[in-house]
C-alpha cells in the first residue's frame, strides 16, 4: 500500500468534511436573504390585487334626480314676413335680424319657448306691399333655422295659416319646422279630421328638462342622462268659427294624463279687454281640465284672470311683428310657466316615453294609456314678462314700459288668486 496516496485521501476527506458545513451555512444564508427580497414582493402583489378588488367593489353610487324642472316662456304673435322681411334684408344680420334682441330674455334660463306662428312658411315669395294690401302672408323659409335657435314649438292655429293653401302652405310650414326640429300643434280649422278621424288640435310635445338632484356625497355621482318632459299643447283658431263641443272635448282626452296648455286665437283686434265670447270659451277650456289658457290674436295685451285658481291670459299681444304705429301694437307679454315635476315611478315612465313624443301625430297618448300612466305631480310658478317691439326689434321691455303693460294686464290682481296646489296631489 502506498502510504502517500492513503495520506492524500485522508487529507481530502478531511477538507470535504470541514468545508461542507460551511457551504451549507453560506448557502442557507444566501437563500434566506433571497427570500427576504422575493416573498415581500410576491406578498405586495397579492395585497395590491386585494386593494384593486376593494376599489372595484366601491363603484360610485348613481343618484337619480328628485324632480325635473321645466321652465317655459310663451309669447304672442311671431311673424317674419312683410316688413319684417324688408327690415332684415336691410340689416347686416339678414335672417338673424328679427331674433337679435331676444338675448335680453336670458334664453339660457328656460328649457322651452313656445309662440304663435302667424304666417305659413313657404318657398313662394310675396313682396311686402302685396302682403299688406291683401293681408295674405307668406314667411320666407330662410328665417326658420334662426327661429330654431330660440323657439321649441309653435301653435299653427290662427287666421293666417291658410293664406298659402294654393301651394299647400300648411304642409310646407310643417315640413320646414320638421327639418329644423321645431315642434308644432294646432290647425287653422278646428273641425279638420284626417282619414282616420283624428283631429289636429292637440299634440303631446316633449322638452328637455332640468334635473334637480339631492346633495351629492362621497362615492356618489349624478345620473348622466337626458330627461324629457311631455306636455299637452292645444291650439284653437276661433276667429271665424267658434269651436264645437266635440272640438272642445279633445282637451279632456289629454288633461287627464298630462299638464295641458291651451293657446286659443280669438277676440276683437286692438281691444285691451276680453269680450264675452272669449270669457265664455276660455273658461270652458279650464272647466274641461286645461291647466292654463294663453291666448293671442288681438295684436294687443288684454286682461288676465284667475279662473278657478288657474291662469287665463286673454291675449299676449304682438311679439315679433311689423306693426309699429302705436305702443299698443308694439307691446306684449311673455307668460312664464315654471314647472317642477316630482320624481316617482310614474314620472320616470313618462320621461322614458317622452322620447317618442316629439313627432307630429305620434302614438304617445295611446302608449301612455296602455302603460296605465297617470298625470304627473308638479308644482307651478307663474309670472308675466313684458315685451317691447319698438324700433323694429323684439326685446324685453324696460321698467317704465313693463309697469304699464302689467297694469293693462291686471296682473297684480290675477297673480294673488292663482292656486296650483291641486297639481301636487
PLM feature segments, named:
Residues 85-100, 134, 138, 198-263, ...:
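Binuclear metal-dependent hydrolase catalytic cores centered on His/Asp/Glu-rich metal-binding motifs
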Residues 150-153, 276-335, 341-343:
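Conserved beta-sheet core of the metallophosphoesterase superfamily
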Residues 35-69:
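N-terminal, intrinsically disordered, polar/charged segments of Gram-positive cell-envelope systems
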Residues 110-122, 158-159, 230-233, 254-273:
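Short acidic, glycine-rich surface-loop motifs adjacent to enzyme active sites
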Residues 74-76, 112-118, 151-159, 184-188, ...:
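Active-site neighborhood of phospho(di)ester-bond hydrolases with catalytic His/Asp-centered motifs
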Residues 124-147, 258-290:
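Active-site-proximal segments of metal-dependent phosphoesterases and phosphodiesterases across multiple
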Residues 55-56, 65-69, 220-224, 273, ...:
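A short C-terminal boundary segment appended to hydrolase-like catalytic domains
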Residues 81-83, 121-123, 159-171, 191-201, ...:
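Active-site environment of divalent metal-dependent phosphoester hydrolases
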Amino acid at each position: 500500500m502506498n502510504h502517500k496516496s492513503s495520506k492524500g485521501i485522508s487529507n481530502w476527506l478531511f477538507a470535504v468534511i470541514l468545508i461542507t458545513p460551511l457551504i451549507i451555512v453560506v448557502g442557507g444564508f444566501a437563500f434566506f436573504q433571497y427570500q427576504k427580497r422575493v416573498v415581500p414582493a410576491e406578498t405586495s402583489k397579492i395585497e395590491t390585487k386585494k386593494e384593486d378588488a376593494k376599489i372595484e367593489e366601491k363603484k360610485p353610487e348613481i343618484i337619480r334626480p328628485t324632480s325635473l324642472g321645466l321652465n317655459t316662456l310663451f309669447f304672442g304673435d311671431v311673424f317674419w314676413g312683410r316688413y319684417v322681411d324688408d327690415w332684415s334684408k336691410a340689416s347686416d344680420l339678414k335672417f338673424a335680424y328679427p331674433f337679435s334682441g331676444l338675448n335680453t330674455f336670458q334664453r339660457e334660463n328656460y328649457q322651452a319657448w313656445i309662440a304663435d306662428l302667424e304666417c305659413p312658411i313657404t318657398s313662394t315669395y310675396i313682396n311686402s306691399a302685396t302682403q299688406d294690401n291683401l293681408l295674405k302672408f307668406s314667411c320666407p323659409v330662410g328665417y326658420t333655422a334662426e327661429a330654431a335657435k330660440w323657439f321649441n314649438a309653435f301653435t299653427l292655429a290662427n287666421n293666417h295659416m291658410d293664406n298659402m293653401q294654393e301651394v299647400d302652405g300648411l304642409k310646407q310650414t310643417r315640413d320646414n319646422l320638421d327639418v329644423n326640429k321645431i315642434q308644432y300643434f294646432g290647425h287653422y280649422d278646428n273641425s279638420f279630421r284626417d282619414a282616420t278621424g283624428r283631429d289636429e288640435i292637440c299634440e303631446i310635445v316633449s322638452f328637455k328638462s332640468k334635473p334637480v338632484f339631492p346633495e351629492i356625497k362621497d362615492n356618489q355621482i349624478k345620473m348622466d342622462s337626458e330627461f324629457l318632459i311631455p306636455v299637452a299643447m292645444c291650439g284653437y283658431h276661433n276667429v271665424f268659427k267658434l269651436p264645437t263641443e266635440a272640438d272642445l272635448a279633445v282637451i279632456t282626452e289629454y288633461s287627464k294624463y298630462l299638464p295641458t296648455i291651451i293657446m286659443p286665437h280669438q277676440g276683437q283686434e286692438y281691444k285691451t279687454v276680453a269680450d264675452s265670447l272669449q270669457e265664455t270659451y276660455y273658461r270652458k277650456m279650464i272647466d274641461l281640465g286645461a291647466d292654463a289658457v294663453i291666448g293671442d290674436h288681438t295684436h294687443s295685451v288684454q286682461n288676465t284672470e284667475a279662473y278657478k285658481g288657474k291662469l287665463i291670459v286673454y291675449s299676449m299681444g304682438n311679439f315679433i311683428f311689423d306693426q309699429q304705429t302705436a305702443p299698443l301694437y308694439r307691446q306684449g307679454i311673455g307668460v312664464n310657466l315654471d314647472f317642477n315635476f316630482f320624481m316617482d315611478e310614474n314620472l320616470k315612465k313618462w320621461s322614458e316615453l317622452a322620447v317618442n313624443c316629439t313627432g307630429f301625430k305620434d302614438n304617445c297618448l295611446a302608449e301612455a294609456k296602455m302603460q296605465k300612466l297617470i298625470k304627473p305631480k308638479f308644482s307651478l310658478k307663474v309670472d308675466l314678462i313684458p315685451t317691447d317691439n319698438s324700433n323694429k326689434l323684439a326685446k324685453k321691455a324696460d321698467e317704465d314700459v313693463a309697469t304699464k303693460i302689467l297694469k293693462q294686464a291686471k296682473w297684480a290682481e290675477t297673480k294673488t288668486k292663482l292656486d296650483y296646489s291641486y297639481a301636487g296631489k
